[in-house]
């Protein structure tokens, strides 16, 4: 029988990743023995692997995060290629966030939401309360000034939040989480990018079949042809993968 409260780690180009078998494994790992882990969750895909390679500040930020997991199918395939016995699957960050929120609602875990447009954040709060009765102890949209950061950190600390999710895009959200943890270390932090927009229906996600086939990237490209430059950049990652430079 598999022990879902532990997980192996795998290394890709110096980055250590948690190997979750599936979503249930991820949840059981994070809520091991009924105690929510503390630290920072960071989703890793091919684009982020390239950024880590090219940007020393981002590399330092992400290396410091305790829980780095394979969000992109390319990363999962690279892990399986380098470690043929690895039982690792993609855990999409947007799905993990929703499952965390559902679990938090069930257990009464206090949650603080950061980021997004004011109207999107308000809709996210309302939907979380209606759908899972999430105990939201505070929120702040992404439109705050740099001089307001410290006061926000203090608000988060005073709220007693055990989960803090930050939708500011990378690397802004990683910088925010690093700095906030200096004031409020006893929580699980998660960078969620554009998840609030998807959750509230402002941005359409790829249909399940595209996700299952590992073609979510292609769906996004067809929906947003302007992403072509970003996709072409990923050819470098494919070279790493197919030449075994992992």
From Swiss-Prot:
The keyword tRNA processing does not apply. GO terms for biological process: enterobacterial common antigen biosynthetic process. Pathway: Bacterial outer membrane biogenesis; enterobacterial common antigen biosynthesis. One of its GO terms (molecular function) is lipopolysaccharide N-acetylmannosaminouronosyltransferase activity. CDD domains: Glyco_transf_WecG_TagA. Keywords: Glycosyltransferase, Transferase. Its EC number is 2.4.1.180. InterPro entries: UDP-ManNAcA_Trfase_WecG, WecG_TagA_CpsF. It is an enzyme of class 2 (transferase). Pfam families: Glyco_tran_WecG. Signal peptide: none annotated. The keyword Transferase applies. It catalyses: UDP-N-acetyl-alpha-D-mannosaminouronate + N-acetyl-alpha-D-glucosaminyl-di-trans,octa-cis-undecaprenyl diphosphate = beta-D-ManNAcA-(1->4)-alpha-D-GlcNAc-di-trans,octa-cis-undecaprenyl diphosphate + UDP + H(+). Belongs to the glycosyltransferase 26 family. Catalyzes the synthesis of Und-PP-GlcNAc-ManNAcA (Lipid II), the second lipid-linked intermediate involved in enterobacterial common antigen (ECA) synthesis. HAMAP family: WecG_RffM. This is UDP-N-acetyl-D-mannosaminuronic acid transferase. It comes from Escherichia coli O9:H4 (strain HS).
């Amino acid at each position: 029988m598999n022990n879902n409260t532990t997980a192996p780690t795998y290394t890709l180009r110096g980055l250590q990743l948690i190997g979750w078998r599936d979503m249930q494994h991820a949840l059981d790992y994070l809520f091991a023995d009924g105690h929510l882990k503390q630290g920072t969750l960071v989703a890793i895909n091919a684009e982020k692997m390239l950024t880590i390679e090219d940007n020393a500040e981002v590399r330092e930020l992400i290396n410091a995060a305790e829980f780095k997991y394979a969000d992109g199918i390319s990363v999962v395939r690279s892990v399986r290629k380098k470690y043929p016995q690895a039982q690792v699957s993609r855990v999409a960050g947007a799905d993990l966030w929703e499952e965390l929120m559902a679990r938090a609602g069930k257990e009464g875990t206090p949650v603080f939401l950061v980021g997004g447009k004011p109207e999107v954040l308000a809709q996210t709060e309302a939907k979380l309360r209606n759908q899972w009765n999430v105990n939201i102890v505070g929120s702040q949209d992404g439109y705050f000034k740099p001089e307001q950061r410290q006061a926000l950190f203090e608000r988060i600390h005073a709220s007693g939040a055990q989960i803090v999710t930050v939708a500011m895009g990378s690397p802004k959200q990683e910088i925010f989480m690093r700095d906030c943890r200096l004031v409020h270390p006893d929580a699980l932090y998660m960078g969620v990018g554009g998840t609030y927009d998807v959750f509230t229906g402002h941005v359409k996600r790829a249909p399940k079949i595209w996700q299952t086939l590992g073609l979510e990237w292609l769906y996004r490209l067809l929906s947003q042809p302007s992403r072509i430059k970003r996709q072409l950049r990923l050819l470098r990652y494919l070279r790493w993968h197919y030449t075994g430079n992992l």
